[in-house]
Amino acid sequence: IEMVLDYLPQSYKCDMNAREQMHYAQCLAGQAFSNALLGIVHSMAHKTGAAFSTGHIPHGCANAIYLPYVIKYNAHEPEAMHRYADIARRVGLGGTSEKAQVNALIAKIEEFNRAMNIPKTLQEFGVKEDEFKEKIATISENAVGDACTGSNPRTIDPATMERLFTCIYYGTCLLYTSP
């Protein structure tokens, strides 16, 4: 995670040394998630990549869009909040409480997304609202059934997944506020 924070912005700007370091970071991340699995960010990205007629949502882009929302959702589970806060502390993000540290982590991810021109919402990505509404129940059901869902720190059912996707589509969510 520290390597990503250090090198991702420069890598995006075509710095070849930073890109090399990101390759190492990706390798380490791959080794980590081979043992720990991934959670619903990836479940959601798996099921939306090719789901909409407006075009393929690249897996990395989908992960980046979904991550801040999923952290907000997961952080309502105390152990998840503690672990996210620990990540924030380890990478030097501020905050006097775990809640503030988690919010700082979310803000940092959102800052990176803006710097790399990653849309904040599925609507901003270009997914048509009528198609989203037509497909969201099936996508949500499939995402809950994805193998990565079982390793998420907070359980989720299809109805809740649908509400989470709706939050991500519009970017306004009263249901999943910051922890």
Model-derived features with residue positions:
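Conserved small/polar residues in nucleotide/adenosyl-binding loops
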Residues: 176-179
